[in-house]
């Protein structure tokens, strides 16, 4: 030890101080570990079968093409092996994961209309406060569905679309969703991409028109409260030519003694000379399997910035990739 210190020119006390500075303090998870009483409106039976996927499609009133997409994704999921190139996930048994849990409220655009216990959860996490101070819009998902979504009037007046995926899928932007949904991340990419294609629910849809600069961030927060459940939100963002956006994603869940699963999907389209910063802060409990897939397609002159802080989880696998002119750039 003394020889090594001498070679580096450090005294022993200096080495100790450097070691102390390099250690990251444990995160206080107390705010994240507070559980709400499980009081769901509907919980899908555990397991994955064509019958459960049909029930999910009916529950969500999917268009026909999405019903078919889900069933095709399930078939691919059943055909594909568990990936052997990452950490072991042998403790994850999909026969004991509820793939859809609907909260006891539909989506609101005013916090005062949300049930008090759910609102208290997001208050503890600081989401309404952040919206008031520094965000252009906020989406808040609780288990499998959005319970809150809102965007500032001045941002909407610029033509910026920020809504939940279900509204985009079945409303004015249905054609755009059909064009872009799971084209960057396809069900055949890997087993958990196929799982996502079969059971996805929730998430946010963003479209920024040509030349529009969104000066303050949008944020979506995904909270998984249900025990033994999965969360499979889909985020789809298109930033058109010459436009710019900063999008923030936050995730957390309380700790249970059984496995929970987060297998979200992010698809980002950055058009010519556009710019997108995508920031993620995840704070997972130690029973969480966090298996995310994120991709961006960046056209000529476009810029994508990935900023990610992913903490906790029993197993975590995050693989953001940017494609530019048919070349992949791992980030």
Regions found by a protein language model. Name each.
Residues 1-13:
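Intrinsically disordered, compositionally biased charged tails
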Residues 10-12, 18, 26, 325-328:
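Intrinsically disordered, low-complexity regulatory regions of eukaryotic regulatory proteins
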Residues 16-19, 23, 27, 42-189, ...:
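N-terminal amphipathic, basic helical "cap/leader" segment at the start of enzyme domains
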Residues 30-44:
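Conserved oxyanion/phosphate-binding beta-strand-loop segments in alpha/beta enzyme cores
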Residues 35, 50-54, 299:
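Short acidic (Asp/Glu) and glycine-rich catalytic loops that position anionic groups and cofactors
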Residues 148-150, 154-327:
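Conserved beta-strand/loop scaffold segments within soluble protein domains that form the structured core
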């Amino acid at each position: 030890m003394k020889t090594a210190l001498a070679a580096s020119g450090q005294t022993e006390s200096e080495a100790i101080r450097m070691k102390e500075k390099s250690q990251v303090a444990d995160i206080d998870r107390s705010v994240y570990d507070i559980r709400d009483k499980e009081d769901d409106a509907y919980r899908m039976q555990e397991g994955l079968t064509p019958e459960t996927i049909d029930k999910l499609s009916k529950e969500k009133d999917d268009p026909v093409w999405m019903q078919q997409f889900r069933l095709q994704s399930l078939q691919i999921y059943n055909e594909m092996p568990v990936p052997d190139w990452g950490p072991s996930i042998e403790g994850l048994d999909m026969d004991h994961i509820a793939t859809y849990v609907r909260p006891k409220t539909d989506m609101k655009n005013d916090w005062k209309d949300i049930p008090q216990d759910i609102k208290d959860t997001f208050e503890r996490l600081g989401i309404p406060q952040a919206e008031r101070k520094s965000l252009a819009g906020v989406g808040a998902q609780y288990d499998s569905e959005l319970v809150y979504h809102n965007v500032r009037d001045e941002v909407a007046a610029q033509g910026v679309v920020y809504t939940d995926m279900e509204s985009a899928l079945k409303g004015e932007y249905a054609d755009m969703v059909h064009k872009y949904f799971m084209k960057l991340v396809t069900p055949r990419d890997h087993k958990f991409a196929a799982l996502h294609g079969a059971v996805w629910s929730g998430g946010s849809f963003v479209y920024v028109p040509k030349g529009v600069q969104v000066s303050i961030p949008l944020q979506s927060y995904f909270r998984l409260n249900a025990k033994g459940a999965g969360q499979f939100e889909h985020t789809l963002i298109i930033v058109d030519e010459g436009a710019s956006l900063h999008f923030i994603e936050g995730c957390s869940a309380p700790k249970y003694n059984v496995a929970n699963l987060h297998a979200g999907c992010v698809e980002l389209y950055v058009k010519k000379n556009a710019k997108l910063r995508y920031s993620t802060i995840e704070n997972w409990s130690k029973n969480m399997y966090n298996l995310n897939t994120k991709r961006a397609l960046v056209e000529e002159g476009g810029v994508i910035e990935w900023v990610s802080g992913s903490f906790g989880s029993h197993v975590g696998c995050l693989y953001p990739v940017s494609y530019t002119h048919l070349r992949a750039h791992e980030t």
